[in-house]
Amino acid sequence: MKKFSMRVVLIISVLFIALGNANVSIAQERDTTNKLPEEELGSLDTSNIIAEEVAQDKPAEVEQLEEIPTTDELMQNPDVLEKSVADSDDPDLTVVDSGAYWTIYRNTVNNEYSLRMFGNVPSSKPTAWNSYLKSIKHIEIEEATLTGNFASYFDNSAFPALESVRIEQCNLSGVTSFASAFYSSGIEKVIIRDNDYPTAPSLLTTQAMFGYANKLTELDVSGLDTSAVTNMQNMFQYCRALEELDVSHFDTSSVTTMRGMFQYCELLDKLDVSNWDTSSVTTMMSVFAECNSLEILDVSNFDTSSVTDMTAMFQNCYALEKLNISNFDTSSVTKMYAMFSGLYEVGKLDASNFDTSLVTTMNRMFQNCKSLKELDIGNFNTSLVTDMDRMFINCAALKSLYLDNFTTAKTMTDMFTGTTSLTYLFVSHNLSTFTGLENTSWYDEKNWVQFSNLSQLQTYHRKQSEPTGYRKGEFLSLTMDAMGGEFEDA
C-alpha cells in the first residue's frame, strides 16, 4: 500500500510541472475537481519518472518482509519447499510434524497423537517417526497407494499405544504381505474398506494379521482382496473380544492353509463361510477351535479333498448345535485328533461317509460330545491308526455306537470312559480292547450270552470272528413247560 501511494504522489507532481506553463488564469477558473482531458494525459511521458521511483530505496518495512517464492521457483528449487501438510477439518488438531506422504497431529483437547498418510506410501517407516511411535493412538490412510511388504507394520512393537487404524479409498494392488500386521496390538478398531485394485492383487499372506489382537472389538475387512492369498494361518487367532466378523466375501480359492484361522474367537456367535472355495486347502487344523460362542456355522459346501490335517478343527465349539459334515471328502486326511472334541450341544454327527484309510491319529476325536446320542462310524477304516486314547471319553448321552471296521490301536487309554448312557455297542472282531467301557452286565444280542462284567465281555469278544453287537444289562430267558412259560433272569 505504501509503495502504491508513493507512485501516485510522483505522478501527480509530474502533472503539475507539465502544466506549469499553462494559462494560470484559465487554470484558476477551472474546478479543481475536474479531471484533465484524456488527450492531455495520454501525451505525458512518465517512463523516466516511474523508472526513478522503482530505483528508489525500499522502505525499511518492506526490507524486513520475506520474499515469497513463485511457483516456478518452487519447482526449480526443492530446497524452498515446505514440508507437506495434510488438511484437517478438526480444529482441535495441531500439526507437530510432517513429510512427503504423512502428517502427525496432536489433539489439543486430549493430547492424543494421530498419524495420517496419503499419496505414495512405502512399507518402510521414516526415522522422523521414532520420537512419536509410543504416542500415536490413531492412524488414517486415505487416498493413498500402498506398495510392498507391510508385515508387522502396525503391531505392538511398532505402535504400542495404537487404538485404531483406518485404510480407506486406497490402492492396495501392490501390497504383498499383511502378515502379523496388527499382531499382539492393543488395537480396538480396524477399518479396511472401499479400497481399489486397479491391477491384479499381489497380497500372498495374511498369516496372523490380527493374531492376538485381543482388545479388537470392531473390524471391517470388506476392502481386502484375498484372491491371491495362499496363507491365512492364525489370521484372526485370539481375537477374543470380537463379537462380529464378516468374511463372507473372502476369495479363498488360492488358500492352502487355514490353520488356527479363527482359533479363540471366543465371542463370535456366527460366521458365514458357506460360499468359500476350499479346494486348495491342505490344513484346517484348529480353524474353528475354541470358538466357544459360535452357534451358526455352515461348512456343508467345503471341498476338503486336499486337506491332510483336521486336528481339532471344531474343538470346543461349545454352543454349536448343528454341524453338517456329511459331504466332507477325507480321503487325504492323516490326522483327526480332537476333531469334534467339546461339541457340547451337537446331538447328531453324520460321519458315515468318511474315508479314514490314511488317518493315523484319532485320539480325543469325540471327547466331551456331551449331547451326542448316536454315532455311526462303522465305515471308518482304522488300519493305520496308532492312537485312540479317550476317543469317546465323556460322551455321556451316547446310546449307540457302531464300530464295524475298527482295529486295535497301539494306545487306547480311556477310549470309552464316561459313556454312561451307552446301551448298545456294535464292534469289529478286530478291536479287542474296550478300555473305560462301563463295568457292568452286558450280553451278546445274537447268541444271548450273558456277561456280568467287562472282563468277561472282552474275553468272549476276542474269540469272535465277525463283528458282534452287545447290549447293556441282563436279558430275560423264557422257560417253557407243559403249563406254559415264564421269564427268568439270566
What is each of the regions a protein language model found here?
Residues 1-9:
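Bacterial N-terminal signal peptides that target proteins for export
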Residues 9-20:
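Bacterial N-terminal signal peptides
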Residues 3, 22-112, 488-489:
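Low-complexity, acidic Ser/Thr/Pro-rich repeat tracts that form intrinsically disordered stalk/linker regions
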Residues 94-97, 134-135, 424, 472-479:
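Short domain-boundary/entry signatures in modular proteins, especially
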Residues 401-475:
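Leucine-rich solenoid repeat scaffolds
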Residues 112-120, 134-146, 160-176, 185-204, ...:
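Structural signature of tandem-repeat unit edges
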Residues 145-153, 176-181, 202-205, 209, ...:
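Small-residue (G/S/T/A) turn/hinge positions that recur once per unit in extracellular repeat modules
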Residues 475-490:
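Secondary-structure capping and domain/repeat boundary segments
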